Curated annotation (Swiss-Prot):
Protein family membership: Belongs to the PMP outer membrane protein family.
Keyword Membrane tagged: yes
Membrane topology, as annotated: Peripheral membrane protein
Entry keyword annotation includes Transmembrane: yes
Organism superkingdom: Bacteria
GO CC term (a single one): extracellular region
Residues of the Autotransporter domain: 661-980
Name of the protein in question: Probable outer membrane protein PmpH
Organism of provenance: Chlamydia muridarum (strain MoPn / Nigg)
InterPro entries per record: Autotransporte_beta, Autotransporte_beta_dom_sf, Polymorphic_membr_middle, POMP_repeat
Signal peptide: 1-24
Pfam annotation, one family: Autotransporter
Subcellular location: Secreted, Cell wall; Cell outer membrane
Length: 980
């Protein structure tokens, strides 16, 4: 069928002499000399359509345009592309245009590549544009810069704002909507003036830009707005319900018109704003997006390295990252009057952003219609500010700058989620003295988590500048619920402090002060101590202060706050008594400035693992208890001392059972089982009567289920691999052979969240011989095997404080051996009670001597709660005894088969249970640990079946069951061999 563009109102027959046609299955290239434009209302692609190297110039209209008011192009799963072309320069013309609505849908690919738009309408122009469905939408390496053409005889004039606002890919007055893209939506390396991709044409910017319901990746990369808005300029912006990853990288907004220099205050048109999005009078919204979102390496000459808007709203359903964005003015990542950011299952990270004001976020001054505000809510996932800097003051940290003192601030965290400021937050306007009432700062008015201010990540040089650790809010601070944490050298100054419902947690070197002129007050009823920060020799007593009165009263309580309880009580300081001078209350009022009451320690006697003892808190220094530096603490007034006293003089240590690490010695049991699996695979050679050189290859499987016994851990091991065997079978029945193989698998703990992924390499020698004992044939067979196994243990500890898992990893190796000597003899015929049974079922007896064991190397764990495992060992000796039955089938249509069954009893006559010493690295406490105590009596069943396959050799199967109290082991092997 010929290629066609069908239209209900336009017939292409009139253009047959001017257009080239081809089959629908091959792309059609329309060369530059094709007469344009196409006109139609409803156009359908019956094949791939490629517009290449077209020059529209100043005399030709749109390449594709509507015959009436609206234009619809349906791709029908074909490609529409424009490459290496120049658009029309005529007024109201573009590559694709309509007066009212344009609908582009269902393309396998819609591609604009290496095109130049010379007209004021950009590349796609209509009051409303809709792009829906399809697999791939790609705009790459295009240029949409525009300046008006001079009249005849005139020289070109300097571009003005009115001209450059007409250069974008999409020229839209009402709205642009992109939806349902299945694989990728890409805008890459596009150059324009205001908004390289989208610029609102409405007078008040009342245009919408929407991307929703897309399944694939969304990419905006390396786009440049020479005058402002690297990607989008003005209009309401919405990204909603997209499922794929969203990446905004390397976009930039410059100020080629010099608007920033001419208008230092925000003008009608905003020059150099928004490296990605600039819509200073409208809202930018991200919600319902399931994939990760990343803004990185974007740049703005003005404000908003990534986004400048009046209102910015973000709900993070997945991970969101703002990193390494830069703005020369304010807001390295975001510049907005109103900022609403929350998590809903994903985390949000602001890291490495830079700006002169607000390295990550700058909240602008209010306007008449909007007072603005900052609302951050770590509802389900953390919000973190780290390593954000000022761009014009090297070495100065800055997370958020709030330019107006009257802006309200709400910082919230729920449950185990945290909001962490490693960089300071500053609210003031140094250019203008504060007027009116300062805004309120509310902590957890809608949450019960932790809002944290810390100087933990400051470098030594950054610590020399106190600004890097100081956050400032001029308004009143209220802790409504959850906790406000100021720790590790951070300082927070506010107006007044009220924390009667929520908790104030202080750490080493922290300072929380109310400094509202001469009226600052501080009232706290719930205190928390960040224990970890104080357990170092360089600790500093925290400060809680006010200009007038400081009160810790109304039945005050103190909570011991720790991120990991088990790790905390591993600290060797708790072997002995220790006193922590926790907090000093400071008031500038000479008399009656400080009020204290006896403090109740909430969780003083909570059961825990680690060193055992008890806590107490008092406003007086306790006797005979040194501080964490080993010195006697100073006796300070208005200071709360927190004291630990061990339960005995030698420090009793209680080990958490899940840290025993019994998987390490149990790995020797697993290695021994793997070697027995290897032996099981050699059964075919032991029962074969063939003569010659035999090579075989087979698949092996090993399954071991060991049940827990009280507080002793069990394990579940699954291993599989291969075995290759070469053996010489002699005429006298003797055999000598070698085997090589590998097994891979995993062992899981039955009690705890720990698993060991291992692989074992095995090499063995084996043989068989026949001996005549008093005229009776006796079969003697033997094997020796060596195994080298590598083990990688991964352990997860659930942390009830954070509701998250802490992880640790450990690697070690085992050297294992297995040897046996066995004999098979028809002694059952010599016993009168068993003689007839032996003759009827072809039964013989057997006895074996087995020896197995090995050594494990030492290993040091990394990660959470690290341990060290010393070298370990384990050995086992057994004397299996049982009977053997043989059966042979010779069907007419089926190949002959030989079945061998061994049944017996295996007593373990000597054993060294696998064991080693485990040491807690934090304190050196050693604990001997043993592997699972296996029962010493087992019953086993071994089944071997050989199938003689003509021209191929033999196929065989082995299955073994070893059953003992609290453990079941299964061995399986399937193989093929060939006689040479």
């Amino acid at each position: 069928m010929p290629f066609s563009l069908r239209s209900t109102s336009f017939c292409f027959l009139a253009c047959l002499c001017s257009y080239s046609y081809g089959l629908a299955s091959s792309p059609q290239v329309l060369t530059p000399n094709v007469i344009i434009p196409f006109k139609g209302d409803d156009i359908y692609l019956n094949g791939d359509c490629v517009f290449a190297s077209i020059y529209a110039g100043a005399e030709q209209g749109s390449i594709i345009s509507a015959n009436g008011q609206n234009l619809t192009i349906v791709g029908q799963n074909h490609t529409l592309s424009f490459t290496d072309s120049q658009g029309p320069a005529l007024q109201n013309c573009a590559f694709i245009s309509a007066e009212e609505k344009i609908s582009l849908r269902d393309f396998s690919s819609l591609l604009f590549s290496k095109n130049v738009s010379c007209g004021e309408k950009g590349m796609i122009s209509g009051k409303t544009v809709s792009i829906s469905g399809g697999d791939s939408i790609v705009f790459k390496d295009n240029s949409v810069g525009y300046s008006s053409l001079p009249s005849v005889g005139q020289t070109p004039t300097t571009p003005i704002v009115g001209d450059v606002l007409k250069g974008s890919i999409f020229c839209v007055e009402t709205g642009l909507e992109i939806s349902g893209v299945k694989k990728e939506l890409v805008f890459d390396n596009t150059a324009g003036n205001f908004g390289a991709v989208f610029c609102s044409r409405a007078a008040q910017g009342d245009t919408t830009f929407t991307v929703k319901d897309c399944k694939g990746k969304i990419l905006f990369q390396d786009n440049v707005g020479s005058c402002g808005g690297g990607v989008i300029y003005k209009g309401e912006v919405l990204f909603q319900d997209n499922e794929g990853e969203m990446l905004f990288r390397g976009n930039s907004a410059h100020d080629d018109l010099g608007i920033l220099d001419a208008n230092p205050q925000p003008p009608t048109e905003v020059g150099g704003g928004g490296g990605v999005i600039c819509t200073p009078e409208k809202t930018v919204t991200f919600k319902g997006n399931k994939g990760p979102i990343t803004f990185d390496y974007n740049f703005a000459k003005g404000r908003g390295g990534a986004i400048q808007s009046q209102t910015f709203s973000l709900v993070a359903d997945s991970a969101v990252v703002f990193s390494n964005n830069t703005a020369e003015k304010g807001g390295g990542a975001i510049y907005a009057l109103e900022v609403n950011v929350s998590t809903n299952g994903g985390s949000i990270l602001f890291e490495g952003n830079r700006a002169s004001e607000g390295g990550a976020i700058c909240v602008s001054e209010p306007i008449a219609a909007n007072n603005g505000g900052l609302t951050l809510h770590a509802a389900d996932g953390d919000i973190i500010f780290s390593k954000n800097m000022t761009s014009d003051r090297p070495g100065e940290r800055s997370a958020i700058r709030i330019l107006d003192s009257g802006t309200n601030v709400s910082l919230n965290a729920s449950g185990a989620s945290k909001m962490i400021f490693y960089d300071p937050v500053v609210q003031n306007n140094p250019a203008t003295p504060p007027t009116g009432t300062s805004g309120e700062i509310k902590i957890n008015e809608s949450g019960s988590g932790s809002v944290v201010f810390t100087a933990e990540t400051l470098t030594p040089s950054e610590k020399l500048n106190v600004i890097n650790a100081t956050s400032n809010f001029p308004g009143n601070l209220t802790v409504s619920s959850g906790e406000l944490v100021v720790t590790k050298g951070a300082t927070l100054t506010v107006g007044n402090i009220t924390a009667t419902s929520g908790r104030v947690t202080l750490g080493s070197g922290a300072s929380l002060s109310a400094v509202a002129g001469t009226a600052g007050t501080c009232t706290v009823s719930k205190l928390g101590i960040d224990l970890e920060s104080f357990l170092v020799p360089t600790y500093e007593t925290a400060k809680l202060g006010a200009d007038t009165t400081v009160a810790v009263n109304n039945n005050p309580t103190l909570d011991l706050v720790m991120a990991n309880e088990t790790e905390m009580y591993d600290n060797p300081l708790f072997m002995n008594a220790v006193t922590i001078p926790f907090v000093t209350l400071v008031s500038l009022q000479t008399t009656g400035g400080v009020t204290t009451s006896a403090v109740t320690l909430n969780n003083a006697d909570t059961a825990h693992y680690g060193y055992q003892g008890s806590w107490s808190a008092d406003w007086r220094r306790p006797p005979l208890a040194p501080d964490p530096s080993g010195m006697t603490p100073l006796d300070k007034s208005n200071t709360l001392y927190v004291t630990w006293r061990p339960s005995s003089n030698y420090g009793v240590y209680k080990l958490d059972p899940q840290r025993r690490g019994e998987l390490v010695p149990n790995s020797l049991w697993v290695s021994g089982s793997a070697l027995r699996t290897f032996t099981n695979g050699l059964k075919e050679h032991y029962v074969s009567r063939d003569v010659g050189f035999i090579a075989s290859v087979q698949a092996l499987g090993d399954y071991v289920l060991n049940y827990k016994q009280g507080n002793r851990d069990g394990f579940l091991a699954r291993y599989g691999g291969f075995q290759a065997v070469a053996a010489s079978h002699y005429e006298n029945g003797g055999i000598f052979g070698v085997a090589f193989g590998q097994l891979y698998g995993q062992t899981k703990s039955r009690l705890y969240d720990s698993k060991d992924a291992g692989n074992i390499t095995i090499l063995s020698c084996f043989g068989r011989s026949y001996i005549d004992v008093k005229g009776t044939e006796t079969v003697v067979y033997w094997e020796t095997a060596y195994g080298y196994s590598v083990h990688r243990m991964h352990t997860q500890y659930f942390n009830g404080k954070t509701n998250k898992f802490d992880h640790s990893k450990c690697r070690w190796h085992n050297n294992s051996y297995y040897a046996f000597v066995g004999a098979e003899h028809n002694f059952l015929e010599y016993c009168i009670p068993t003689r007839q049974l032996a003759r009827d079922y072809d039964l013989t007896g057997f006895m074996r001597f087995e020896m197995s064991g090995g050594w494990s190397s030492g290993a040091k764990e990394t990660g959470a709660l690290p341990r060290h495992f010393d070298r370990g060992t384990g050995h086992n000796m057994s004397l299996p005894i049982g009977v053997v039955a043989h059966a042979v089938s010779n069907g007419r249509r089926s190949p002959p088969s030989k079945l061998t069954i061994n049944m017996g009893y295996r007593p373990d006559i000597w054993r060294v249970t696998p064991h080693c010493n485990m040491k807690i690295i934090a304190n050196g406490v050693k604990t001997p640990i043993q592997g699972s105590p296996l029962a010493r009596h087992a019953f086993f069943l071994e089944v071997h079946d050989t199938l003689y396959v003509r021209h191929l050799g033999r196929a065989y199967m082995n299955y073994s069951l070893d059953a003992r109290h609290r453990q079941t082991t299964h061995f399986v092997s399937l193989g093929l061999n060939r006689i040479f």
